[in-house]
């Protein structure tokens, strides 16, 4: 069993725009001891290294995702339309539909949930498929980002207006009991969406992730990669984009 497994997902437009580029860069520059699981939604990416990368069909491998989409596909609020909500529809940003597009972001979270249940490694790491690995990334450098005394690692945004994490990269220590509790709570927010995500002020994955994280703040064991880069209160925390300007930016 690999010590570290990365998980990602994309659909056909994503494959063409960025997904294949990401897979190729990962296979070329990331240490071969770090594996990847790809959930491909109705598309057929070229696997640059089948020994390192496993590609699965989302439509066959993510039954809970299929059920979630079927359950909510005709519900406007699950697709970003909050015009019928007396409270949320009055928000100044009510036109930013992505904040309430639960269907769109469900692909990502259900890929994480399924990989978690499969227990492929000690560490499970989510990476957005629109990333690009521009420099060689050794096992030691990758592992340094995943300390064993932490149950979760993530990229925060500081104290600005966007206080939800930047969920393009986060690590989950599957050997830590708090991580199991966190992920089970995260999944339950979607499985019982009416009493879960739809009770929140927003329901894109980063906001939901942040709400769960806040509930676990009383416990030690989280690592925010960008905690030291914030200089003042601002939309980005005052230090620029947290992924690019934090420790992940070197790769």
Descriptions of predicted regions:
Residues 1-94, 117-121, 174, 247-251:
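N-terminal anchoring/stem segment of glycosyltransferases
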Residues 13-17, 102-106, 200-203:
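Conserved phosphate-coordination/catalytic loops
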Residues 20, 106-110, 203-211:
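A structural signal for well-ordered alpha-helical segments within the folded catalytic domains
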Residues 90-99, 195:
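Short glycine/proline- and acidic residue-enriched helix-loop micro-motifs
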Residues 100, 104-154:
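GT-A fold catalytic core of metal-dependent nucleotide-sugar glycosyltransferases
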Residues 108, 127, 165-168, 205:
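Residues that flank catalytic or metal-binding motifs in active/ligand-binding sites
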Residues 134-202:
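Conserved catalytic core of nucleotide-sugar-dependent glycosyltransferases
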Residues 172-251:
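Catalytic core and acceptor-binding pocket of nucleotide-sugar-dependent glycosyltransferases
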């Amino acid at each position: 069993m690999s010590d570290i497994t990365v998980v990602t997902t994309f659909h056909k437009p994503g494959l063409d725009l960025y997904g294949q580029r990401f897979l190729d860069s990962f296979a070329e520059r990331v240490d071969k001891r770090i594996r990847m699981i790809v959930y491909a939604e109705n598309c057929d990416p070229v696997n640059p290294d089948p020994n390192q990368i496993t590609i699965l069909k989302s439509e066959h491998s993510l039954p809970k995702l299929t059920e979630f989409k079927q359950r909510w596909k005709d519900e406007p609020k699950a697709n970003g339309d909050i015009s019928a909500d007396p409270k949320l529809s009055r928000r100044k940003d009510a036109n930013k539909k992505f904040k309430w597009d639960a269907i769109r972001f469900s692909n990502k979270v259900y890929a994480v949930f399924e990989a978690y249940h499969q227990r492929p490694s000690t560490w499970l790491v989510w990476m957005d498929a629109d990333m690009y690995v521009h420099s060689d990334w050794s096992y030691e450098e990758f592992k340094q980002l995943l300390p064993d005394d932490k149950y979760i690692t993530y990229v925060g945004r500081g104290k600005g207006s966007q206080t939800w994490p930047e969920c393009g990269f986060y690590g989950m220590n599957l050997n830590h009991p708090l991580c199991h509790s966190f992920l089970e709570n995260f999944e339950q927010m979607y499985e019982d969406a009416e009493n879960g995500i739809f009770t929140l002020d927003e329901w894109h994955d980063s906001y939901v992730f942040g709400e769960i994280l806040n509930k676990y703040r009383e416990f030690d064991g989280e690592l925010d990669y960008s905690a030291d880069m914030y200089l003042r209160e601002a939309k980005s925390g005052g230090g620029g984009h947290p992924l690019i300007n934090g420790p992940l930016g070197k790769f």
